[in-house]
Amino acid sequence: RTANIVGGGDWSYKRLIPDAIKSFTTNKTLIVRNPNFTRQWLFVLEPLKGYLVLAKKQYGKLNKFSSNWNFGANSEISVIEIVKLAIKFWEKSKYKIVKNKKFIEQKNILLNMSKTNKYLKWRAIYNTKKSIRLTIKWYFDVAKNNKKPSEVTNEQIESYMKLANLK
């Protein structure tokens, strides 16, 4: 199981980052439903590394490593903090808080990482701020700098692989 995943290229409906990007690129106000809800926000490449570490551990020791594993960020942060970071990185945008009782979500979603940290020795490389910055940069480079999505994605993969000592 993973925390809330962030990264460029997600255009899903009713999701915080995609909704923010849509509002930023159309100069509309971002509607924020639950500003004080907290989540762990994990860059899209992080759990992939975690899955590879787990697969390597499972090889030959399936019984020991065949249970549930959580891959999450090193900290949790509120929705409003994510919104403010996204606006800071995009540079010009605005938001409005609108209470919506029809859309029911859990207030705090936090994964317990102790087992993963102890037995897999896995931790996220990027902190939440860096994850959000890279995510917003992906969209900014595509929307404002006219870069190809594949080019920005490949740059981010290369950078991550170097940091993770995977290359």
Region locations from a protein language model:
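Flexible, glycine-rich beta-alpha linker
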Residues: 1-16, 38
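Active-site Tyr-X1-5-Lys
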Residues: 1, 19-26
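C-terminal substrate-binding subdomain of Rossmann-fold SDR/epimerase-dehydratase oxidoreductases
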Residues: 24-167
